[in-house]
């Protein structure tokens, strides 16, 4: 009888333990469900006023976002109400969630020294910042045009800081890789072709009988490198640009060259402060600007725009197995109404967000530059893994899905 009682007690204890475990799992499940239910939506509203912590529209145009130590830093052009000239410099904002932004002030200020390359009234566009793990420095590159010279200078500028919010110290500006041929032209066949042609043929400023641009013959000569050779001694032109840090830590400067006709992808030095001389021409003669790059599942993707000034146009898209190519062009990645004008925007950056990617673009307002808006959209992928974009009036960062009104 005593043994029987012990057995009963043991069974009751075992059953108690099991029930406790089940209850624990049930409570944990309820906690997870409650957590999900309480998760606040992080809503992105494209094309509208985006207020910062002071209730003022974010002023960071043509910019990019850096994630560092769990904080996002958004850098962009500070634009004034009446001019697109650089009267202030590059602004910086910080955020923990990509929705609510704190104004951190001016990261790179223009100079009051009239002899400085970045003197007040220059053109300073498309600033991007990357962090160098080896040096512990934050490096900013940007497109620079010297004051009073329009878009003639076509320079790249570089600045550096010890902290993400700055202040950034301007180092220098100039054209890129002077005296060095791009990799695709540095071979005997390409050099022989270049020896047969001369930019003077198309130079209206020096040749009264100059031949017209945009003919099939002109396009063939551009493809062959006639403008790259013209700019060889002084360095390649560098206008609209972005930066990209690859999986191995190498960084690349990607910019519009050759009168905006051709993109260059140039490797940066280990400290990210200069170029190594290794670079390629991409889509020669294609007239691309506003490059934005990301990497997914072994493929490099780039979205660009055409060249129509402040007016929007159809986006272009390219992919490659290596950052140095070869690059293959795709159709316009945008779908739906206003796809032919990229929903009114122009690409500036693609931001990785977990396993997802955010397409960042600007909606320019040239008559009121500071009122330019931001077009942020989730990048989607079709059944073949090809990226595409659809406009959403509102969408949630938690789900990457549209939010109903």
Question: What are the residue ranges of the model-derived segments?
Answer:
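Carbohydrate-active catalytic/glycan-binding domains of CAZyme proteins
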Residues: 13, 36-405
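Bacterial Sec-dependent N-terminal signal peptides
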Residues: 1-40
């Amino acid at each position: 009888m005593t043994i029987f009682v012990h057995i009963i007690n043991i069974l009751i204890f075992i059953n108690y333990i099991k029930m406790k475990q089940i209850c624990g799992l049930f409570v944990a499940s309820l906690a997870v469900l409650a957590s999900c239910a309480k998760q606040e939506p992080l809503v992105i509203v494209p094309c509208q006023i985006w207020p910062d912590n002071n209730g003022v529209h974010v002023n960071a145009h043509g910019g990019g976002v850096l994630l560092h130590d769990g904080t996002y830093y958004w850098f962009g052009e500070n634009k004034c109400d009446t001019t697109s000239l650089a009267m202030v410099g590059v602004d910086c904002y910080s955020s923990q969630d990509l929705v609510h932004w704190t104004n951190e002030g001016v990261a790179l200020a223009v100079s009051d020294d009239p002899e400085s390359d970045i003197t007040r009234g220059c053109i300073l566009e498309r600033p991007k910042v990357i962090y160098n793990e080896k040096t512990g420095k934050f490096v900013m590159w940007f497109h620079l045009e010297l004051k009073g010279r329009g878009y003639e200078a076509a320079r790249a500028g570089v600045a550096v800081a010890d902290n993400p919010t700055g202040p950034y110290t301007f180092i220098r500006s100039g054209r890129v890789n002077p005296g060095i041929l791009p990799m695709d032209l540095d071979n005997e066949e390409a050099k022989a072709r270049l020896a047969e042609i001369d930019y003077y043929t198309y130079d209206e400023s020096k040749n009264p009988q100059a031949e017209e641009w945009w003919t099939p013959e002109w396009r063939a000569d551009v493809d062959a490198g006639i403008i790259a050779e013209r700019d060889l001694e002084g360095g390649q032109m560098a206008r609209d640009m972005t930066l990209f840090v690859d999986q191995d830590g190498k960084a690349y400067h990607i910019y519009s060259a050759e009168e905006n006709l051709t993109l260059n992808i140039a490797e940066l030095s280990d400290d990210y402060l200069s170029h190594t001389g290794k670079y390629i021409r991409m889509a020669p003669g294609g007239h691309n600007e506003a490059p934005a790059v990301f990497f997914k599942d072994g493929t490099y993707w780039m979205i660009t725009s055409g060249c129509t000034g402040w007016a929007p146009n159809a986006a272009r898209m390219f992919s490659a197995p290596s950052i140095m190519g070869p690059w293959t062009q795709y159709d316009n990645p945008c779908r739906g109404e206003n796809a032919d004008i990229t929903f009114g925007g122009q690409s500036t950056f693609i931001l990785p967000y977990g396993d997802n990617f955010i397409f960042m673009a600007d909606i320019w307002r040239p008559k009121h530059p500071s009122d330019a808006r931001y077009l942020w959209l989730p990048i989607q992928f079709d059944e073949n893994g090809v990226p595409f974009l659809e406009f959403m009036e509102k969408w949630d960062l938690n789900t990457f899905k549209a939010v109903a009104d």
